[in-house]
């Protein structure tokens, strides 16, 4: 019996970077919640973006944000998994030195830091994704212990550019995962979306077999592998489809919505 449903957003429910979602999702999710199912939004997005996307039912959901590094209710942070300062600052310096074509940002549970308020990444995150942004002169000069994610950005081939040097340099010191063609997300070592879901499973005294997950990209693989029921949308990467127990129609055909309706 399914007691908790968790879904990714970008590429799974909507087009990457969109704040437009089929409104039928809201009514179907609301009915599932009325049946006693816990519904979790589980994305690489910031809380403010997830909150805006699900506005009609936002106070009924639980939120896993920033790729599994923050777990929260609509009003309270339950758990965070911060990065070591030396790690995210070292990553920042390497992108500057080795990947001049790429940009980057550092995230706290409530907002993100970027270094150029006029840059494409700043406008993309603020205007398309609905993120709360802060402009700073130099991210490496920040004195903070609440950085939970460092992300590298390139509009077309971030994973390709990061593969020769950046990923080998850091993949034993942090959890790295491609999140679409534009992003490589970096979390504290061992921290993924499944880490955050495991926290909720323990909190609600559930079993993995009572959990259903939906996803499309590499940062979804752990939760798709470990959940009792899991679906990759058919537009997902081949590795993700292989990790999931089932496949559903692509996001533009509302594949996840069809599966959710079958649970009513």
Give short role names for the model-derived ranges.
Residues 57-59, 67, 169-172, 226-227, ...:
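Short, structured coil segments at secondary-structure junctions
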Residues 94, 101-214, 218-226, 235:
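Conserved acidic, metal-coordinating active-site core of Asp-based
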């Amino acid at each position: 019996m399914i007691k908790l449903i968790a879904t990714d957003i970008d590429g799974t429910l909507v087009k990457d970077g969109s704040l437009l979602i089929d409104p039928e999702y809201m009514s179907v999710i609301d009915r599932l919640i009325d049946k006693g199912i816990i519904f979790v939004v589980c994305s690489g997005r910031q809380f403010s973006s997830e909150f805006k996307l699900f506005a009609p039912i936002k106070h009924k959901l639980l939120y896993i944000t920033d790729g599994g590094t923050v777990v929260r209710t609509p009003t309270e942070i339950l758990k965070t998994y911060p990065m070591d300062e030396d790690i995210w600052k070292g990553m920042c310096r390497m992108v500057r030195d080795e990947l001049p074509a790429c940009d980057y940002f550092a995230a706290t549970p409530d907002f993100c830091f970027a270094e150029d308020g006029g840059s494409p990444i700043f406008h993309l995150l603020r205007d398309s994704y609905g993120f709360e942004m802060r402009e700073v002169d130099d991210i490496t000069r920040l004195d903070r212990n609440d950085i939970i994610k460092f992300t590298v950005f390139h509009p077309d081939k971030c994973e390709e550019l990061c593969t020769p040097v950046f990923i080998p340099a850091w993949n034993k010191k942090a959890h790295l995962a491609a999140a679409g063609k534009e992003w490589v997300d970096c979390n504290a070592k061992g921290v993924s979306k499944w880490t955050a879901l495991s926290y909720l499973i323990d909190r609600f005294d559930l079993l993995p077999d009572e959990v259903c997950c939906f996803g499309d990209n590499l940062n979804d693989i752990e939760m798709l592998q470990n959940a009792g029921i899991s679906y990759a949308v058919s537009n997902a990467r081949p590795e993700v489809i292989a990790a999931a127990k089932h496949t559903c129609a692509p996001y533009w055909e509302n594949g996840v919505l069809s599966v959710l309706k079958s649970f009513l």
